């Protein structure tokens, strides 16, 4: 079973990049070094093999290696959420079962994509994956995979193992409504790095994002401003983060993120 309960998975959670060597193999040494860097700079957990982790360009073996390496390095100090989404349900279940055996604290998945799926198909996908392990499931709502509407999200929240939502969209009014409707035991994570402050003010329990690889400590300060009800201070810090984000997003993602990590001397 997981070491952390869902209500303990909160705060600043980097959607961890996957680090490769020059031969395009997973660089486990760099991965371990990055885990320590992020923990030292305020990370409250890790979200593995998601969009930022380039999961859809990786083999099952590569994804599992990242999971094994990070969980071994973390050694139970912080919660680890593993994204197991894939274009096929069977492969997603295989990834979920591995995450459970490896010691992950929760699993997550984007909805099925490429073809146009009906709400019932998406519901069945999440049902099958969430039932494949005892781990809590975090539904991942993101434009790239096709945003799910509120009715479907509320339906998915009724599945026994679904206990959270990663909401990567700018309509924070909807996110806040979902949190208010489902109550404090259902965890909401804001997924827009450029709107982390807004997300937390709208009721999110934590933030999961790409740029927290670079400066988790800055986002830790943003969350502190939310706790202190310091609106001006929080907005000021968010603007600092946004300057980097908006400049970076003029270039190809996620390669620009790797270049920024190199620029900081981290990768």
For the regions a protein language model found, what residue spans apply to each?
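C-terminal substrate-binding/catalytic lobe of Rossmann-fold NAD(P)-dependent oxidoreductases
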Residues: 250-255, 261
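An extracytoplasmic/periplasmic, membrane-proximal ligand-sensing/linker region
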Residues: 260-266
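Secondary-structure boundary/capping positions in well-ordered alpha/beta enzyme cores
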Residues: 77-78, 136, 163, 185, ...
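Structural signal for well-ordered, non-membrane alpha-helices
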Residues: 71, 242-246, 258
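Catalytic alpha/beta core domains of metabolic enzymes, predominantly
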Residues: 128-132, 143-251
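Interdomain hinge/lid region at the active-site interface
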Residues: 253, 266-267
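Active-site beta->alpha loop and helix N-cap motifs at the rims of alpha/beta catalytic domains
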Residues: 2-14, 19-147
